[in-house]
Amino acid sequence: MATIEEIAHQIIEQQMGEIVTEQQTGQKIQIVTALDHNTQGKQFILTNHDGSTPSKVILARQDSTPGKVFLTTPDAAGVNQLFFTTPDLSAQHLQLLTDNSSPDQGPNKVFDLCVVCGDKASGRHYGAVTCEGCKGFFKRSIRKNLVYSCRGSKDCIINKHHRNRCQYCRLQRCIAFGMKQDSVQCERKPIEVSREKSSNCAASTEKIYIRKDLRSPLTATPTFVTDSESTRSTGLLDSGMFVNIHPSGVKTESTVLMTSDKAESCQGDLSTLASVVTSLANLGKTKDLSQNSNEMSMIESLSNDDTSLCEFQEMHTNGDVSRAFDTLAKALNPGESTACQSSVAGMEGSVHLITGDSSINYTEKEGPLLSDSHVAFRLTMPSPMPEYLNVHYIGESASRLLFLSMHWALSIPSFQALGQENSISLVKAYWNELFTLGLAQCWQVMNVATILATFVNCLHNSLQQDKMSTERRKLLMEHIFKLQEFCNSMVKLCIDGYEYAYLKAIVLFSPDHPGLENMEQIEKFQEKAYVEFQDYITKTYPDDTYRLSRLLLRLPALRLMNATITEELFFKGLIGNIRIDSVIPHILKMEPGQYSKTSSL
């Protein structure tokens, strides 16, 4: 055991003229010399490295206990102590003294310090002596499999005052000082929610923090992350994306209404539709259970476990689709279904599904293809809004937009007049175009720019971790840029709700999809939508001669959007590898009576 004189000699000889960092304040200081060798404890003067007046004097006294040295200031009461470490001084062995203490009497205040930040330790946690703050930080990081990045050179100051500035360096310091990751238990969940998301600690809750100002939606400043320990890859969003969507001083609207209030009463709220599809999925599951209860139980188990999504995809049964359908429905908060009973009741009298055997030439009927009630496009975002944008919030928001688009199509009598088979075929063929138009229409309320920036950040992260090939990354990046370019161009055109409704109708009634029946009838509906669109533009924008042409020229860009990539970006984190095409028939096969039955659930 080195004596205090030897330690002092090491300090003076090895660090003379060197700059060291005070761990409590992060101040850069320099050891100058030693004073008064006759004192009971060695005294050292520490000055700022710029040569300014010496600010602190420390006393180093050796304790009788091996491996412990007391550091104190002669002018303080041991509360605001300055300390530093040498190879013989470990932070976990430092204890603080007041000036009038002596080695014989023992210190007035004796307590261990956190090995990570130097704060007062509360005990040994996960294998190291730490404070409560570092204990909680380490537990959250390991349980949720969070990963961070350092904006500096990975040697940031971690002390009591600066420990929250760099989470990457703080976590690395926790591990370096002996905190064991395998000592952290998975979070326990209540019994009543055991059927929810798997208790796997690494299940889609990892975070990427992006400091984001929504007032400038295209200028995100991301903090990129790395996760060398993650081996599971279920898609682009498997790492989870978290973006701060609550900047101070920015008003965030959770609902957008594209037309006047008079149209709102004619549009059923999305939460009612959620109740309908939840009920339908439950009926489907009950039917499957009567045929094979064991198989259905396994399907439910797999669908609730992120680690089994690949197996979930391979099963390809009706129960699989119903379960994915149920998952989408749950994302739409079915508990709010009673809010719009009157809206659905109003629709029931005007919308009638016509089977494929019916032959009705709807073009001979009087009245427009679209009315004011078909212009309303009210998107309600998930509530409460989280502080950080995550993969489930993105999936829930996208699911609401998807169901709202399907709900809008069902409200058009001409669409229902085509019959069930044709309706399903049309939506399967063009749901991606309708969804993309919805993204542009709800650009602000969904914070689409922030979501797209999140996707880009995740691509960079996946490339750094070699989770994705360069070709795959290029394909995804091109799709994201196409989305951004399309939405930006639509926003710049200041398109109103009527124009969006007619654009969607023109897309929906496209007769060029193979396998469609009554193609002539579908083409007539499209022509009727175009004529009404032209009349509206002429009356509303008489001075803008080329507005109609500019809007129609944006539609070909929709065909460049890959539906499979859209599914991976927006829905895979919610329903795994289930295709949207498999979910669409469940939505469109609902009878009008089911709306009223489930609206009171």
UniProtKB/Swiss-Prot annotation:
Feature: DNA-binding region: 111-186
Database matches in InterPro entries: NHR-like_dom_sf, NR2C1/2-like_DBD, NR2C1/2-like_LBD, Nucl_hrmn_rcpt_lig-bd, Nuclear_hormone_rcpt_NR2, Nuclear_hrmn_rcpt, Znf_hrmn_rcpt, Znf_NHR/GATA
Keyword annotations: Activator, DNA-binding, Isopeptide bond, Metal-binding, Nucleus, Phosphoprotein, Receptor, Repressor, Transcription, Transcription regulation, Ubl conjugation, Zinc, Zinc-finger
Post-translational modification: Sumoylation requires both PIAS1 and UBE2I. Sumoylation appears to dissociate NR2C1 from the PML nuclear bodies. Enhances the interaction with NRIP1 but inhibits interaction with KAT2B. In proliferating cells, stimulation by all-trans retinoic acid, activation of MAPK1-mediated phosphorylation and recruitment to PML bodies with subsequent sumoylation, suppresses OCT4 expression.
Superkingdom classification of source: Eukaryota
Residues bearing the modification Phosphothreonine: T221, T223
Chain positions covered by the region annotation Required for interaction with NRIP1: 585-601
Cross-link entry Glycyl lysine isopeptide (Lys-Gly) (interchain with G-Cter in SUMO2), positions: K251, K589
A single cellular component GO annotation: PML body
Domain NR LBD, first and last residues per copy: 349-591
One of the record's GO molecular function terms: zinc ion binding
Glycyl lysine isopeptide (Lys-Gly) (interchain with G-Cter in SUMO) crosslink, residue number(s): K251
Pfam families per UniProt: Hormone_recep, zf-C4
Zinc finger feature spans (NR C4-type): 114-134, 150-169
Alphabetical list of CDD domains matching this protein: NR_DBD_TR2_like, NR_LBD_TR2_like
Sequence positions bearing Phosphoserine: S198, S216, S582
Subcellular location per the Swiss-Prot or TrEMBL entry: Nucleus; Nucleus, PML body
Region Required for interaction with KAT2B, annotated ranges: 1-179
Keyword match Metal-binding: yes
Assembly and oligomerization: Homodimer. Heterodimer; with NR2C2 which is required for chromatin remodeling and for binding to promoter regions such as globin DR1 repeats. Interacts with ESR1; the interaction prevents homodimerization of ESR1 and suppresses its transcriptional activity and cell growth. Interacts with NRIP1 (via its LXXLL motifs); the interaction provides corepressor activity. Interacts with HDAC3 (via the DNA-binding domain); the interaction recruits phosphorylated NR2C1 to PML bodies for sumoylation. Interacts with HDAC4 (via the DNA-binding domain).
Family per similarity comment: Belongs to the nuclear hormone receptor family. NR2 subfamily.
Functional note: Orphan nuclear receptor. Binds the IR7 element in the promoter of its own gene in an autoregulatory negative feedback mechanism. Primarily repressor of a broad range of genes including ESR1 and RARB. Together with NR2C2, forms the core of the DRED (direct repeat erythroid-definitive) complex that represses embryonic and fetal globin transcription. Binds to hormone response elements (HREs) consisting of two 5'-AGGTCA-3' half site direct repeat consensus sequences. Also activator of OCT4 gene expression.
Name the record gives this protein: Nuclear receptor subfamily 2 group C member 1
Origin species: Pongo abelii (Sumatran orangutan)
